[in-house]
A protein has these predicted regions:
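Conserved helicase motor core of P-loop NTPases
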Residues: 1-105
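C-terminal accessory regions
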Residues: 101-102, 109-196
Length: 196
C-alpha cells in the first residue's frame, strides 16, 4: 500500500490523473492532505514537466477567488496560498519568526514555503515559521512549487510523492534520477506515466 503505478499514455491524461490524486484521491482515500503531497518531474518542459504541472495544480488546488491576493511576475501569477520554492541562495534577506520575536538572515535554494499574503507589491511567504517579505525585485528568487524537478527535490523528503514518468528524455529517466525521486517519499509513492 505504499507504492502504486498508474499507467497513462499521453500527457494530458497523466496531468489530469496527477491533479485528481492531489485534489481528491490521496486526501480522501489515504488521508494525506494536499499540502503533504509533492509532485516531482524529471523535467521542467514537456507535457508532464513542472511548468505544465504547476499551472494545472494551481488551477485545481488554489484557484483565483475574489479578495485573494495575486501578483504577476513573468508568466506566473503568484496567489495567496501558493506553494513556492526559493531558487537562489540569498544570504542578505531578512526573515522573522511567525508570531515571535526571533529573526535572522538568509534563505536558501530549495526552501519551500507558502504565500501567506500579497499586499500591493509585497509577497509574504512563510517558510515553516520563517516569514519573508519579497519586494518586486526579489520575485525572481521564487518559483511555483506544487511540482518541482527531481533535481530540486534532492535532500528533501515528503510524506507522499507523485512522480510523473512520461515523455522525458532517456537521460532524465535514468536509474539515478528515479532513485533520487523514489527516495524522497516517506510513506507513499505514486508513479504516473508510461510503463514501457
Amino acid at each position: 500500500n505504499d507504492f502504486f503505478f498508474l499507467t497513462r499514455r499521453d500527457g494530458q491524461s497523466a496531468v489530469d490523473t496527477i491533479v485528481d490524486l492531489c485534489r481528491r484521491r490521496l486526501p480522501e482515500r489515504m488521508g494525506i492532505p494536499a499540502d503533504q503531497i509533492q509532485v516531482l518531474s524529471p523535467t521542467r518542459r514537456r507535457s508532464t514537466g513542472t511548468k505544465a504541472l504547476n499551472q494545472a495544480l494551481q488551477a485545481a488546488l488554489n484557484p483565483p477567488l475574489d479578495g485573494k491576493g495575486e501578483r504577476r511576475f513573468g508568466d506566473w501569477v503568484f496567489r495567496t496560498g501558493d506553494r513556492v520554492m526559493q531558487v537562489k541562495n540569498n544570504y542578505d534577506v531578512l526573515w522573522r519568526e511567525d508570531g515571535g520575536a526571533d529573526s535572522g538572515m538568509g534563505m536558501f535554494n530549495g526552501d519551500i514555503g507558502v504565500v501567506r499574503m500579497i499586499d500591493r507589491e509585497i509577497v509574504t511567504v512563510d517558510f515553516d515559521g520563517r516569514v519573508v517579505e519579497y519586494t518586486p525585485d526579489m520575485l525572481g528568487e521564487l518559483e511555483p512549487a506544487f511540482a518541482v524537478t527531481v533535481h530540486k527535490a534532492q535532500g528533501a523528503e515528503y510524506r507522499a510523492v507523485i512522480l510523473a514518468v512520461l515523455d522525458g528524455a532517456p537521460m532524465l529517466l535514468s536509474r539515478s534520477v528515479l532513485y533520487t525521486a523514489i527516495t524522497r517519499a516517506r510513506e507513499l509513492l505514486v508513479m504516473v506515466g508510461d510503463d514501457a
